[in-house]
Amino acid sequence: MTNKVRTRFAPSPTGYMHVGNLRTALYAYLIAKHDNGDFILRIEDTDQERLVEGALDVIYNTLKITGLSHDEGPDIGGPVGPYVQSERRNIYIEYAEKLIEKGEAYYCFCSKERLDMLRANSEALKRPFRYDKHCIDLSKEEIDKKIAEGVPYVIRQKNPTTGSTSFHDEIYGDISVDNSELDDMILIKSDGLPTYNFANVVDDHLMGITHVVRGSEYLSSSPKYNRLYEAFGWDVPIYVHCPPIMKDEHHKLSKRNGDASFEDLMAKGYLKEAILNYIALLGWNPGGEKEVFSMKELIEAFNYRNINKAPAVFDTKKLKWMNGEYIRALSLDKFHEMALPHYKEALTRDLDTKKISELLHTRVEVLNEIPEQLDFFNNLLEYSPEMYIHKKMKTTYENSLKSLEEVLPRLEALENWTFENIKEVCMNLVKELEVKNGVVLWPIRTAVSGKQFTPGGAFEIADILGKEETLERIKIGINKLKALQ
């Protein structure tokens, strides 16, 4: 089993799929698939107090939507299940007892009050809290007596106080820690469930995990993990600790602070492919100029040794740009299908939405921008006549009024209202008046939209609005300009 690359995504069902969690899943998936390996889903629910109802569905749905399909997991089974930690309780107790037999762990009966006192003393001395090994030398008789009396206990790792523990991480290199800094961490809690740290090591070994991908915040725990591997006589997996994702230079991206989850980004109109592509580049450098990768290309190109140590800043502008690239790469039909719900939300008039899609397809970066681009189609917005003055277009109040008054009867006479016919009428007027295009087209665009920036120009907007509405808006424009005289 260990000859084959096996990675795992092991989330806790505690709420939304945070961007950092999704990147961990993606990197683990890419490492496995780059070498035709297995990607395993394991649910870490040992911290029962933090569990959130419905969070498990979020995990399954996210993996399904993103296409990060697991080869083994709670929902599909596999050869090394169960894949939910709360269903493996007896396994952890068995392995904790093996450590006690080896002299690598011990029972601790210290009360909450005693531990609170130790913590308070540590805080007063401004030192990190470490358990004082009070129960390390209890005799078998004392232990048996306390267990028989029903005294609550935990099982702790027995760490040496001299020497050092070293480990290698593929991103951060060789790291060595003095054993005197290692706390005798709890392996089995008083409720009989394992701690996250202990369950991880046992499960990663029993499930044949070859590469452990996780955030750099777990670097400090890795020496304790290594001590467990050594105590059991197990091979240590390859560690890939990923740099943190930052909101800006000084603040980490955090779901506690309400920063974007995968669900939030999808709800804002980002495409799943763009989100995954962008997240892949948060810390990983493929080399070269290429930035837009399909999943197949990511699998082929991904090399975890090219992950940077430096924190990656989540740049919403960059994500938006990338999303725009993906939207433009869609077929018009596919874009139209994705835009339809936004049209239904934004439009109050019966318009040709396929024509609107032709306008927006190359102009929208995020689907949620669609409604704000369409407001003028419903009703002509109140606007200032000053909009008719445009230095670059060489328009004034006077020539704007002339253009609108000249084009109105020509458009009124148009029997077949199409884009091409509207364009022909307007361009013929440009020739007749012997002016630059903008002198005619800018006033028309202003009159029909009431906005300085619109998707599409005068011809497209007039075509979509229809004859009656276009003529009505041009008349309003004429009246606005006449009122200035």
UniProtKB/Swiss-Prot annotation:
Its source organism is Clostridium botulinum (strain Loch Maree / Type A3)
| Role according to the record | Catalyzes the attachment of glutamate to tRNA(Glu) in a two-step reaction: glutamate is first activated by ATP to form Glu-AMP and then transferred to the acceptor end of tRNA(Glu).
Q: What EC number(s) does the entry state?
A: 6.1.1.17
The name this protein carries in UniProt is Glutamate--tRNA ligase
Which family is this protein grouped under?
A: Belongs to the class-I aminoacyl-tRNA synthetase family. Glutamate--tRNA ligase type 1 subfamily.
Q: Where does Zn(2+) bind?
A: C108, C110, C135, D137
One Pfam family matching this protein:
tRNA-synt_1c
Keyword presence, Ribonucleoprotein? no
Q: Name one GO cellular component term.
A: cytoplasm
Keyword annotations for this protein, in alphabetical order, are: Aminoacyl-tRNA synthetase, ATP-binding, Cytoplasm, Ligase, Metal-binding, Nucleotide-binding, Protein biosynthesis, Zinc
Name the cofactor(s) required for activity, per the record: Zn(2+)
The record's CDD domains line, in alphabetical order, gives: GluRS_core
